[in-house]
């Protein structure tokens, strides 16, 4: 092992074992996948990190819910790690930082201590506070309601319901409700509130209020990722993402249909 001095005078190891390279690469790949990266990018990033540290062979298999990596080290030893991905979404800030970290690793081959430090900073990165997220949901719902033909009063009602959707999703996440049920219940609750706001005179066009809030829940990024996976040749991941997007859309539609059935009589 080679030892070198950092700027602060502390000695650090400038050599990574095969196990350390594997853990480093799969950690970054896992966070990329959880942040919304396409499968081809995840596999390519892991492969490049392994190549940077002179791994003889790397075999990576990744789908939306799992990553399996097997490496052959310089001493002809084979090692494998598997990661189960339980949840994922879209985090562009984290994607950008992870991509920068992977480029840094490939270009400079930093020591493990620095990699872990940069990785920890990314994991503990800034998150929008709940109030800001509610405000973003409200403004987005308002914009879509007006865009699709509603008036200012419809937009105001959509803002209220949009903030309520964010609060409802927070509550469902806190109790770890399964996505299929949270999508149905969130859609049904927001649909009922849309109908009630129209009933008490806070909106003129209930359809526009509903559309503005449906757009908050539509899995557009997930559908786009599925086609991106198809184009990259990752058919299994593409089918998984496509199926999830379709099922999510069906759940959203079912929730709003239930709200119309329950409160449709007051329209």
Question: Model features per residue range: what roles?
Answer:
Residues 88-136:
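Hydrophobic alpha-helical segments and helix pairs
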Residues 113, 154, 221-225:
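Short helix-terminus and kink motifs of transmembrane alpha helices
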Residues 118-122, 165-176, 224-236:
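C-terminal ends of transmembrane helices
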Residues 198-267:
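Generic detector of multi-pass transmembrane helix bundles and their immediately adjacent loops
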Residues 126-202:
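Core alpha-helical transmembrane segments of integral membrane proteins
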Residues 83-87, 148-153, 205-208, 242, ...:
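Interfacial loop-to-helix junctions that mark the boundaries of transmembrane helices
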Residues 1-108:
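Soluble N-terminal domains of membrane-associated systems
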